[in-house]
Regions:
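Conserved "landmark" site that anchors the functional core of diverse proteins
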Residues: 1-331
């Protein structure tokens, strides 16, 4: 049994996989990696199944001892990681010898860095997922963010071809043996997080006046300090909310842009409530969800409307790249 010992947890570090889809009718939001594209790539670099659990660090990383050694990969934002004092490259599989210590600092770019390990982080599944759901205190490691002194178990690498294949699991694309791999320059460029988020019309978009839609599409918004995994709160152009910003509650989706009475939009995120009573002017497209996961407080964003067919085409293009041999190269 191989272990990860938490010497310092960082600001907010949790165990996350790709989430628990399909439980919205039971009131359980998907949770999972805020930037699932990065987590999936980190796992591919290691030969893991794409949906394997890793550690999601937010804004400030932790310090981890590897008493038994491990094969690792870092994905997402650069947190200035060092292994025994030597810099570690992002987006590249590397090996830590038994007893070595991996340290992270503050972010140098986006919001989240993913520490992936060959074999994955092994925890008790909750509703078919290893993801930590902070608001309910379930899943992950004891239902909470990591603390100093926590000890995590690394799974067996040779079990990757027998990963769960239920509704919450990505395929075992990439599972198997692995050499030293690096994300390709093309993939790094095409999957770069965006600050202009593409959106399709929301369920109540026709409730909003043309003037309100113009404000939404032409304003620059700043990510508020109060943002979290439940919702990304924005500050900027005030959108006149129809019906006083209230409506009969209905089911909501990841990436929905709600407009409450105050007129400041809220983007529903991975630990969103499953129903909501605010009108929704738009929905961030699936191909841009990973960009949401890299937004930091005070980052500035804009919105760009696209048609449904465009949104589907962009997602299909992204998934084609994720599944292709051009995603990474052998070193």
């Amino acid at each position: 049994m191989r272990l990860i010992e938490v010497l310092e947890p960082g600001l907010f570090t949790t165990v996350q996989d790709v989430g628990r889809e399909g439980y919205g009718p039971l009131g359980v939001s998907p949770s999972g990696a805020a930037d699932a594209v990065s987590l999936r790539i980190g796992n591919r670099l290691l030969g893991n199944a794409e949906g394997e659990a890793g550690l999601e660090m937010t804004l400030l990383g932790g310090t981890f001892a590897l008493p038994d050694g491990a094969v690792l990969a870092l994905a997402g934002s650069d947190f200035g990681a060092t292994l025994e004092g030597k810099p570690v490259e992002m987006w590249t599989a590397f090996e830590a010898a038994p007893g070595q210590v991996l340290r992270f600092g503050p972010t140098r770019s986006g919001a989240r860095c993913y520490l992936c390990v060959r074999g994955g982080v092994e925890v008790q599944l909750f509703l078919d997922s290893a993801s930590t759901h902070i608001l309910s205190g379930l899943g992950g490691h004891k239902g909470r963010a990591l603390k100093k002194g926590d000890v995590l178990t690394i799974g067996l690498a040779n079990r990757n071809e027998q990963k769960r294949t239920g509704k919450n699991a990505y395929s075992t694309v990439g599972a198997g043996t692995v050499g030293k791999r690096r994300l390709s320059a093309r993939a790094l460029k095409e999957l770069q997080p965006r600050k202009v988020l593409r959106v399709t019309p929301g369920p109540q978009s026709d409730w909003f006046s043309e003037a309100a839609k113009k404000i939404f599409q032409e304003s620059t918004y700043r990510v508020a300090e109060e943002s979290n995994r439940m919702g990304i709160r924005l500050q900027g152009g005030v959108i006149p909310a129809p019906a006083g910003g209230e409506m009969i509650s209905e089911g909501v989706s990841l990436g929905a842009v709600q407009v409450p009475e105050g007129g400041q939009p809220i983007i529903l995120f991975v630990e969103q409530q499953t129903t909501g009573g605010y009108p929704k002017i738009a929905n961030v497209i699936s191909a841009d969800f990973h960009s949401l996961g890299q937004l930091r407080p005070r980052d500035e964003i804009r919105f760009e409307r696209v048609e449904w067919d465009t949104a589907r085409t962009l997602l299909a293009k992204q998934e084609k790249l994720m599944a292709s041999e051009e995603l990474m190269r052998e070193l």
